[in-house]
């Protein structure tokens, strides 16, 4: 690597990013996934960064060359991205690679040497860059908590996810879907570590050295997409393994039951799961070498337990999850947590004994759910008064619009500075008059795909046809001095197949002329229209009851979510058969018909407890939050 002649680059703060631009940025790594092979031929890495503006940016980086992606070893590292393309996806700003994308990575520790990590032979690094790295280090030292997921073996506990810095002593192929790594970090686990039977396997490594270190060595099974990475590792190399999972397993011998601590790197890339080789120059490797040199090799560990890596599944005769069920090592959760991933799990039996309010992380299976007819789960929810109501049926809407169509439009309210008006007289319907008012943009009629219509006297079928041709439609009627909303029992805004409703209790309706404040906008955002008209908009939500079972207890939890849990908008599912099928498939996967519950997938969830008072009766209820369906399930 060598420096190139200095070029003056401009770096954009993360709070000033705009979609469609190509920028240069600096940031501190808050989350990352080590490079992994995508479904195509490229490698992919996901990196979330933050800077002094406290704005986060998630970047999806692709390259045909593994080494061309950022060389990140842990959260807190500092990155510099050149020629990063900014786009907006699902209302979230994100960065993606563009032509000529390049990156540098620096250790984020205060006082550490500022040495760029990059696979590029040539790069630009000036005194200004040096100052920016130092400034980010200082800021991060007071604004970001150090990652406590990086643990030593002596500190790990069962049912934990953590990152491990270690040295590879040996490796062996187990089968096509799993691979064995023997590693150490100079410390001993607090529980006996398991041993994978390898009598028929070829173990690569110094067997005498491994035997000498057996009291300090652990066996890790890695699965699925991580196998090809594990296979390429060199014995003796220093590794960081991300999101390693520990489980305490009971094994029955002749006269006693023994416990052993298992280590698994599950398939997939959730929570940054993966393996990275660390260079000898890395400061964490320096510390690891010191730990290895001072390790007490003669210390006696608890008796190691030898166990098979893949016991057969067994199903209990009862319809509840077996407390001692042997979970298959590769089995991943069908749901994932969107925050607080490293909180300890709590068994349901303990939750049921505690007072509310509390928050818990659980792992359970779905025994049953309501309603079984999933389209019935979509409701309308007011975020202000928390009222829940049914989504109006088409037949009810048709009656509301037919009733509105009996009133004749007032000629005095037509053709104003806000809109141009056109009147149609229907045939064979007693000369029913329909008024359509085309809202202008600064006095000019916009194109149909940008145009808002106000319609008087239209039927449901007529309004639906217009909503497919124009940007938005608002059903109105003639008032004494101005046009008014038809009725909050009907949608206040229709966009394509989406009907937007308002809360009758919380809304204080304003004149249609208040839309003047929005006429210079190029799109009609439902929340902006609602605000202009004094409407508190209702949200489409899925409302369901899940009966959860973890083998220690059974608990009913309430799900109320607009789009995060299923990653499918509740506002669209009623009008889209394909989306309805997707939700049906997800629920059939959670709760498969015709098989016993032990074969159901695990669900990883956050739930919160709260008190509900009904007269003199007090009840504790539970609600699911910060949980979403895993990407590989959708």
From Swiss-Prot:
**Outcome after substituting residue 259 to S:** In PFBMFT8; uncertain significance; affects function in telomere maintenance in patient cells and when expressed in heterologous cells; decreased DNA binding; decreased localization to nucleus; no effect on interaction with ADC; no effect on localization to telomeres
Query: Where does the record say this protein resides?
Result: Nucleus; Chromosome, Telomere
Q: Which UniProt keywords apply?
A: Chromosome, Disease variant, DNA-binding, Nucleus, Telomere
Protein name in UniProt: Protection of telomeres protein 1
Q: What does changing residue 89 to C do?
A: In TPDS3; complete abolition of POT1-DNA complex formation, thus disrupting the interaction with telomeres and leading to elongated telomeres
Task: Report where it is expressed, by tissue.
Answer: Ubiquitous.
TM helices/strands, residue ranges: none
The species is Homo sapiens
Looking up Gene3D superfamilies in the UniProt record yields:
Nucleic acid-binding proteins
Q: Which gene encodes it?
A: POT1
